[in-house]
């Protein structure tokens, strides 16, 4: 607990809100171009080959974004839409690629949770 004298010398600093997705610069999504598409392994105790892409955004910032869903068609120079949202077991991956927009096609044969993977309703 500071004394009154200490508060006069240096006032209390307000807690500034630190953004979890600074590369988006306050926008809900940003467009970018894939510079590299590759796989990385997650932290312990998980084990897999997670698909990620290095993306250069229109703002000029280069980020690492996760490619959700099973299978993808992304390659170098693909145009993608990126949203915020980290992947808990991949350090440094704080963004997700939005499936079903621009060059990222939706997940094939997806029945449930379709809106998250860019899949239109399948008519019988």
Swiss-Prot record:
It is found in: Plastid. GO terms for biological process: translation. Keywords: Plastid, Ribonucleoprotein, Ribosomal protein, RNA-binding, rRNA-binding. Its main location: plastid. One of its GO terms (molecular function) is structural constituent of ribosome. Coiled coil: none annotated. Gene3D superfamilies: Nucleic acid-binding proteins. Belongs to the universal ribosomal protein uS12 family. NCBIfam families: rpsL_bact. Part of the 30S ribosomal subunit. This is Small ribosomal subunit protein uS12cz/uS12cy. The gene is rps12-A.
């Amino acid at each position: 607990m500071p004394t009154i004298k200490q508060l006069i010398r240096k006032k209390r600093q307000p807690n500034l809100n630190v953004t979890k997705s600074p590369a988006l610069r306050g926008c809900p999504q940003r467009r970018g171009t894939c510079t590299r598409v590759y796989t990385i392994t997650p932290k312990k105790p998980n084990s897999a080959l997670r698909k990620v892409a290095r993306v250069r955004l229109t703002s000029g910032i280069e980020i690492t974004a996760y490619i959700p869903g099973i299978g993808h068609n992304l390659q170098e120079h693909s145009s993608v839409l990126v949203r915020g949202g980290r992947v808990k077991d991949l350090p440094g991956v704080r963004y997700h690629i939005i499936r079903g927009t621009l060059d990222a096609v939706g997940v094939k044969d997806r029945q449930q949770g379709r809106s998250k993977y860019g899949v239109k309703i399948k008519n019988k």
